[in-house]
């Protein structure tokens, strides 16, 4: 009855009799996702849930939603949605849940588990009212609270479509918390919901069957994510180093520009200094030239005065006939004084010249100015000990270390020869000395256990055919193919001890002391160096004999 009253209208709106509200008909999920992306492109810092609620309030109008976010009125709309949901939860505590709410009443962990199933469902299930419900249709008995829960589920779906990796990590975290809280309670709740709501029986049964498998898969994925987290941590560390390296590289380019700028400034300063020096020299030259002109003028003036005085004295000598005796004495004294000052005339001519200390000036010019060279304070980093240990722990170094600790071949062969009986064939001796660089492994009969490589046998080990097989095995081990493989070194290392025990068994048999029940090693396989199992009939015959 409620479904008939809540049918879709062609006008794009739906009247819900339960909540007495007019709801907009949202359309398909893809259309809603396009609207969410359109709002997210303009308002990137808002969550999908907030965008969906505001879109629902404005009848899925993108322009009004964006305007509400930009003006700040969207917070009031979100508060209205939150208050309405709380009131409805208080009223519906004691009411029985409708048939369409089991998937909404399940904890968040079950939502996260069933998200992938709901995404793989046909698009016809998502084409219900506004595209927000999970189970395919919404009844009239559902309130705004169930609608908001459906919107949260839709936001989770949108986040998974946008970022599948983050959604998978969130799913793993939720599943892990669900497993810690107890899987049995969760299964009991799911079985209870299954018994109450018979209309959802096939779907809930399928979920309850697939839930343990999904949980085990998620737990296995959580175990596999432990090294993944370690690798992410290492990658984050190397990302920090890469960022530091990038900053240093950018700073190197900047320092290169700084060096060029400093060089240009220094060259400009140098040219300016020498230009000042040149101007100073030119000024000094001009000053000296002017001074020389003054000196020349002064000297010429002095000489001119001397010339005039000489001419005056000469005129007086012409009238000396008319002078008295006293005047003549004065004239002779003046001439004598004039002539005595002749040396000053000579000094005057020598003083009027330019003198300078060019060498001192050259030395000062040579030492003029200093250029500071860059100091290379960089050094090479010494390698860490961890890198050295890693390099030493390589397989080649390990094999080299094991070969260096092996015993010397002469001591092995001499020890083996002393333990052989007189009746031992030389083939066994050749077999014992076939591997000179393998250490002597001494095995006591009481400490041996019947496992890999040792089985109790009878006198059959002293059989000539068996000795021939051992001899052929010794020759086979001496071949280049067997000695070249590093994976077979564990099998040849037991050869000296085996030959000693075989020699003791053979000597006991030839001396007639009885059949030796001491276990001897079986013949190794020719393919991979593993012990070869003999038939059980040979063992029973050896025991009976």
From Swiss-Prot:
Family stated for the protein in its record: Belongs to the SPATS2 family.
Single GO MF annotation: RNA binding
Originating species: Homo sapiens (Human)
Compartments (UniProt record): Cytoplasm
Biased amino acid composition, Basic residues: 85-96
Entry-linked PANTHER family: SPERMATOGENESIS-ASSOCIATED SERINE-RICH PROTEIN 2 (PTHR15623:SF10), SPERMATOGENESIS-ASSOCIATED SERINE-RICH PROTEIN 2-RELATED (PTHR15623)
Organism superkingdom: Eukaryota
Bias (Low complexity): 379-415, 475-490
InterPro entries cross-referenced by the UniProt entry: SPATS2-like, UBA-like_sf
Keywords: Cytoplasm, Phosphoprotein
Compositional bias segments (type: Polar residues): 106-123, 369-378, 491-514
Residue positions where Phosphoserine is found in the record: 143, 146, 148, 520
Protein name as annotated: Spermatogenesis-associated serine-rich protein 2
Main location: cytoplasm
A single GO cellular-component term on record: cytosol
Keyword match Phosphoprotein: yes
Region (Disordered): 85-137, 197-216, 369-545
């Amino acid at each position: 009855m409620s479904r008939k009253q809540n049918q879709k209208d062609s006008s794009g709106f739906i009247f819900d009799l339960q909540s007495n509200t007019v709801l907009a008909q949202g359309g398909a999920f893809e259309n809603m996702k396009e609207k969410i992306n359109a709002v997210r492109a303009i308002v990137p810092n808002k969550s999908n849930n907030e965008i969906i609620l505001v879109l629902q309030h404005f009848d899925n109008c993108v322009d009004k939603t964006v305007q509400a976010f930009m003006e700040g009125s969207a917070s009031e709309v979100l508060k209205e949605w939150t208050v309405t949901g709380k009131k409805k939860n208080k009223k519906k505590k004691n009411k029985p849940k409708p048939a369409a709410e089991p998937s909404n009443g399940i904890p968040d962990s079950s939502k996260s588990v069933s998200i992938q199933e709901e995404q793989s469902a046909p698009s016809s299930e998502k084409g219900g009212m506004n595209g927000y419900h999970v189970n395919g249709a919404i009844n009239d008995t559902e309130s705004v609270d169930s609608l908001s829960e459906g919107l949260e589920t839709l936001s989770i779906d949108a986040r998974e479509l946008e970022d599948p990796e983050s959604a998978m990590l969130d799913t793993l975290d939720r599943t892990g918390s669900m497993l810690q809280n107890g899987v049995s309670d969760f299964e009991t709740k799911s079985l209870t919901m299954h018994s109450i709501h018979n209309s959802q029986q096939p779907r809930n049964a399928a979920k309850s069957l697939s839930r343990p498998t999904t949980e085990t898969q998620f737990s296995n994925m959580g175990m596999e994510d432990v090294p993944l987290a370690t690798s992410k941590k290492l990658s984050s560390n190397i990302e920090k180093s890469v960022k530091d390296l990038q900053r240093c590289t950018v700073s190197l380019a900047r320092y290169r520009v700084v060096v060029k700028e400093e060089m240009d400034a220094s060259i400009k300063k140098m040219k300016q200094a020498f230009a000042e020096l040149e101007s100073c020299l030119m000024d000094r030259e001009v000053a000296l030239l002017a001074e020389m002109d003054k000196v020349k003028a002064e000297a010429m003036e002095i000489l001119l005065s001397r010339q005039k005085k000489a001419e005056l004295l000469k005129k007086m000598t012409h009238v000396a006939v008319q002078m008295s005796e006293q005047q003549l004495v004065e004239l002779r004294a003046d001439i004598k004084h004039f002539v005595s000052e002749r040396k000053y005339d000579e000094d005057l001519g020598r003083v009027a010249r330019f003198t300078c200390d060019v060498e001192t000036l050259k030395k000062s010019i040579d030492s003029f100015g200093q250029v500071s060279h860059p100091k290379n304070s960089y050094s090479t980093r010494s390698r860490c000990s961890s890198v050295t240990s890693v390099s030493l722990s390589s397989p080649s170094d390990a094999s080299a270390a094991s070969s260096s600790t092996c015993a010397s071949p002469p001591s092995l062969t001499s020890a083996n020869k002393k333990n052989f009986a007189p009746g031992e064939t030389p083939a066994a001796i050749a077999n014992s000395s076939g591997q000179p660089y393998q250490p002597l492994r001494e095995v006591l009969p009481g400490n041996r256990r019947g496992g890999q490589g040792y089985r109790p046998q009878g006198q059959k080990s002293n059989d000539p055919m068996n000795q021939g097989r051992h001899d052929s095995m010794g020759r086979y081990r001496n071949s280049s193919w067997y000695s070249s493989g590093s994976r077979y070194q564990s099998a040849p290392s037991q050869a000296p001890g085996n030959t000693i025990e075989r020699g003791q068994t053979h000597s006991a048999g030839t001396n007639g002391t009885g059949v030796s029940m001491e276990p001897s090693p079986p013949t190794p396989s020719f393919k991979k160096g593993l012990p070869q199992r003999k038939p059980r009939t040979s063992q029973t015959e050896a025991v009976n004999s």
